[in-house]
């Protein structure tokens, strides 16, 4: 089964659903709101007539629950504010909510009533756009704004990390760690560069002239891809999985062959791919830090693990079996609680934010 068939957030609105556990992503959206507002408002020129009758907005990897609803609200309010400033007529707004086919679009669409009630006097529309952002999604020159929060760091496939003899090089781990050989780090970076370049290349023909793209990725601050704030929870999950192996609940070979299809880039790595791909000019680029330790709600081990479970469980359950998920995350919470007592836990969440403008006179093949 391909990654595109198993990467989605936990469905529904139950205890472990993404709807109930996406608090961290909402904090990221709030922190990066000014950048999104500026990108939206840059679509309007300083005239007294609206340059656009319809604004087409794509949300890549929108997921479900409060995250896409909050992003939609920010876009609507930014356009309302700019049109009020210019004294121009409000355009209609068409949202294209994109995610893989496994996404719970039913729950997503049920939540739209919140936005409908909030913006009764704004003419806006929403439609689903299932598909992979690693390929084409929309017609040429059709999108004015492409937005993505915490999606494009997902890889199209897990990097192949084996020796020439076919043996796992990252045994006992599910991501890079301090003990991983250089080949593991190189494989992850290479896969990210290939996939992120595809995201840019396929969006370029889809954006209208002077269109903007705002991408928010879960990243890292340092040049070291195994820094603690990035790898901590994945190392913790690997430890919990190893415990289940020792209990005979998981086959050791399954753990040895598993690597998460996810990469946390640095700002420099993101900018390097953008420059090399060549379709966009970078208008803004920054690293945003959120403190998640101390007295923050995320210092509660149970909440922290639920926050991780809501987006990682589908991939993990496909590899190891749905029947062990409760035991896995219970063990992870137990390890995390002990680390909290000893002050070992990671305390920061890092985001990379870029605002890109489509270059003119592009030629596509």
UniProtKB/Swiss-Prot annotation:
Protein's recorded name: Probable 7-methylxanthine methyltransferase 3
A Pfam family reported for this protein in Swiss-Prot or TrEMBL: Methyltransf_7
Native species: Theobroma cacao (Cacao)
Membrane as UniProt keyword: no
PANTHER family: S-ADENOSYL-L-METHIONINE:CARBOXYL METHYLTRANSFERASE FAMILY PROTEIN (PTHR31009)
Pathway(s) where this gene product acts: Alkaloid biosynthesis
Domain of life: Eukaryota
Record GO terms (molecular function): metal ion binding; S-adenosylmethionine-dependent methyltransferase activity
One GO term (biological process): methylation
Involved in substrate discrimination, annotated site positions: 147, 218, 262, 322
Residue positions binding theobromine: 25, 150, 153-154, 311
UniProt remark on cofactor binding: Binds 1 Mg(2+) ion per subunit.
UniProt-annotated binding residues for S-adenosyl-L-homocysteine: 18, 62, 67, 99-100, 132-133
Protein role: Involved in the biosynthesis of theobromine.
SUPFAM superfamilies: S-adenosyl-L-methionine-dependent methyltransferases
Family: Belongs to the methyltransferase superfamily. Type-7 methyltransferase family.
Cofactor: Mg(2+)
């Amino acid at each position: 089964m391909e990654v595109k068939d198993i990467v989605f957030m936990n469905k529904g609105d139950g205890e472990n659903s993404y709807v109930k556990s996406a608090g961290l992503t909402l904090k990221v959206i709030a922190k990066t709101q000014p950048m999104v507002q500026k990108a939206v408002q840059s679509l309007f020129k300083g005239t007294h007539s609206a340059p656009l009758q319809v604004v087409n907005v794509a949300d890549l990897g929108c997921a479900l629950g409060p995250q896409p609803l909050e992003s939609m609200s920010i876009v609507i309010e930014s356009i309302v504010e700019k049109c009020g400033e210019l004294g121009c007529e409000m355009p209609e707004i068409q949202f294209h909510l994109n995610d893989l086919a496994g996404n719970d679009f039913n729950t997503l669409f049920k939540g739209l009533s919140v936005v409908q009630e909030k913006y009764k006097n704004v003419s806006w529309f929403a439609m689903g756009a299932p598909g992979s952002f690693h390929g084409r999604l929309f017609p040429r020159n059709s999108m004015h704004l492409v937005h993505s929060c915490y999606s494009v760091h997902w890889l199209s496939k897990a990097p192949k990390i084996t020796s020439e003899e076919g043996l796992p090089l990252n045994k006992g781990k599910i991501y890079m760690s301090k003990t991983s050989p250089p080949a593991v780090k190189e494989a992850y970076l290479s896969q990210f560069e290939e996939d992120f370049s595809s995201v840019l290349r396929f969006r370029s023909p889809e954006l209208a002239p002077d269109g903007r793209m705002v991408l928010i990725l879960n990243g890292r601050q340092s040049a070291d891809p195994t820094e603690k704030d990035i790898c901590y929870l994945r190392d913790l999950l690997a430890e919990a999985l190893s415990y289940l192996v020792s209990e005979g609940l998981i086959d050791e070979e399954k753990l040895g062959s598993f690597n998460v299809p996810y990469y946390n880039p640095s700002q420099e790595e993101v900018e390097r791919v953008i420059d090399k791909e060549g379709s966009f000019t970078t208008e803004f680029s920054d690293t945003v830090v959120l403190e998640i330790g101390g007295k923050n709600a995320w210092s509660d081990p149970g909440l922290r693990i639920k926050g991780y479970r809501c987006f990682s469980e589908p991939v993990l359950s496909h590899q190891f079996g749905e029947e062990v998920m409760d035991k896995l995350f219970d063990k992870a919470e137990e390890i995390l609680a002990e680390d909290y007592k000893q002050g070992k836990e990671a305390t920061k969440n890092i985001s990379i934010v870029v605002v890109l403008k489509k270059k003119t006179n592009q030629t596509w093949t």
